């Protein structure tokens, strides 16, 4: 059985179910949200210890309760949690999810499907994107501003929830309800391409089909709670607060042009894991060595030295000398 056929067969497992806003997002509300019964293999895994930013959660509630929600275009800096937020929504709703990844060399056929020779016959075999469209799975266009613009144009009818006619005459009708969302570092208009160099510019006809959101890094109290949920009993609260304060300072340095990139939530979690591992080491300064593994070794030594001064300020632990950098 082909992967496409297998994806079709799993649709029989889908049974509608209803969840409350409180069950999905954690704040008091019995407003119902449409989802499915547990058990489908394409439901994403929830992130352990995930904490919702209240503003983003309320935006999701508005989107999820629309009769026919438009596709989302969620723009924001790298590692701020765009894809993670979507995956946690669909995990809580037990909604099977297909994540579509592409790059500038990707062609429409690569994601929509291809004509193939089967048993001596030429047939069109739809890709998982069309299967998701037909069955009512959630669709995430990951890092969509890296797509070839022609790919997005080929998806116009899907973004409109229109009937799609395949090359062999097969008609694919959209499910009665589909959640489609795209994540991106830019708005698709070229702004920010100096930082995110592999991104593309899309025409207004494509961009007009999306509801636009902006995400940034979570507020300090949310990041602190994320660390607390992940490292409780392993790291002191004062250490986690200082880590978040350092991340905020690094992002400010980035905005001021003093750091080539911002530190992400992923980087913070990596720093915490590496700090726990290195805690008892005597051959390195654990606080700084774990930070460098998470983020610091990815920047110029002189920039790293500047970042170390931020850590020193927030933790009160003297920074080690970096070879080749004059104090």
Where are the language model's segments positioned?
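Short alpha-helical interface patches
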Residues: 110, 208, 268-276, 312-314
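C-terminal engagement/docking regions of AAA+ P-loop ATPases
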Residues: 47, 281-327
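AAA+ P-loop NTPase catalytic core and its hallmark functional loops
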Residues: 2-238, 245
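Short coil/turn residues that cap or connect secondary-structure elements
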Residues: 136, 143, 235, 279, ...
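Conserved AAA+ ATPase small/helical "lid" subdomain
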Residues: 219-293
């Amino acid at each position: 059985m082909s992967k496409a056929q297998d994806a079709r067969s799993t649709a029989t497992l889908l049974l509608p179910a209803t969840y409350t806003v409180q069950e999905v997002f954690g704040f008091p509300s019995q407003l119902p949200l449409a989802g499915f019964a547990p058990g489908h293999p394409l439901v994403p895994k929830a992130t352990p210890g995930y904490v919702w930013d209240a503003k983003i959660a309320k935006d999701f509630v508005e989107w999820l309760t629309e009769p026919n929600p438009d596709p989302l275009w969620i723009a924001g800096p790298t590692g701020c949690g765009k894809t993670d937020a979507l995956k946690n929504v669909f995990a809580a709703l037990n909604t099977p999810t297909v994540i579509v990844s592409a790059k500038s060399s990707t062609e429409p056929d690569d994601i929509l499907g291809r004509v193939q020779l089967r048993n001596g016959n030429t047939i069109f075999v739809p890709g998982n994107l069309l299967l998701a469209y037909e069955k009512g799975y959630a669709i995430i266009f990951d890092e969509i501003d890296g797509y070839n613009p022609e790919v997005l144009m080929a998806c116009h009818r899907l973004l409109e929830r229109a009937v799609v006619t395949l090359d062999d005459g097969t008609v694919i009708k959209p499910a009665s309800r589909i959640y489609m969302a795209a994540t991106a570092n830019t708005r698709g208009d070229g702004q920010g391409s100096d930082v995110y160099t592999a991104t593309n510019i899309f025409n207004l006809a494509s961009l007009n089909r999306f509801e636009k959101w902006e995400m940034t890094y979570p507020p300090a109290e949310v990041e602190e709670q994320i660390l607390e949920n992940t490292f409780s009993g392993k790291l002191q609260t004062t250490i986690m607060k200082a880590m978040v304060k350092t991340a905020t300072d690094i992002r400010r340095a980035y905005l001021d042009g003093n750091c080539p990139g911002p530190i992400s939530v992923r980087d913070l979690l990596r720093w915490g894991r590496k700090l726990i591992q290195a805690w008892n080491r005597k051959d390195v300064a654990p606080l700084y060595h774990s930070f460098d593994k998470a983020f610091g070794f990815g920047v110029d030594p002189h920039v790293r030295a500047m970042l170390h001064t931020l850590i020193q300020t927030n933790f009160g632990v003297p920074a080690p000398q970096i070879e080749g950098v004059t104090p």
